[in-house]
Amino acid sequence: MRHPQIFAHRGARVVAPENTLPAFQKALDMNVAGIELDVHCSKDGQLVVIHDFTVNKTTNGKGRVSDFTAAELASLDAGSHLSAEFASSGVPTLHQFFDLVGNRCRVNVEIKSEDPEGGNQVEPLVALIQKRALYDQVIVSSFNPITLLKMRYTDPKIQLGLLYETALPPHLRQAWFTPIMQPEALHPYYPIIDEKLMTWAKNKGCAVNTWTVNDVTEAKRLAALGVDVIMSDVPDLIMAAL
């Protein structure tokens, strides 16, 4: 059985607050193959690492991420919701993440955007990847195909992954999609993965990276099918089982 790479979903979020520097450090300590994280743009145009469109759920603040500057987001308490020991952990910038991680693992950057035209994260993310020479290390994913299309046109060397959680989206089935923008990877929700999907993806030349798998039995099923990446909240558990 071919062993898939295991990515820490939002860092090691079971033992440290998700999408914070401590969670990413603990993921590195587990020797994961990769880390998955989410990015938004702050009020002052910086890429910041947080999952939701608001800060309400994972910090002591209230409001939309885009209404805070990066400095204001850094000053929030993004850790106490898990444990008081992480109270000093704020919302990091993507630059701070890469300062910590360096080239020690692969990175899946998911662009969060409610904008049907793709959002304002594309240009600064492309600039960061170019400046830090991250082409081989980073894959950019999104549920929004327009976001990925903007990425492709802005810099065709950047690796892309299309997220989806139901049956194959129409824009993947249509003939125009492949010549315009075929992603390097498909990121389907794990319950829909079967032999048919794997065969289709491999025939298209796409890797299959799946999320969010926390059950060992399910991880073994996916590994047997030949998925390339398994993203998990418990990467240490999944790695030990495989």
Task: Annotate each language-model stretch with its function.
Residues 1-242:
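Phosphate-group recognition and catalysis centered on beta-loop-alpha active-site segments
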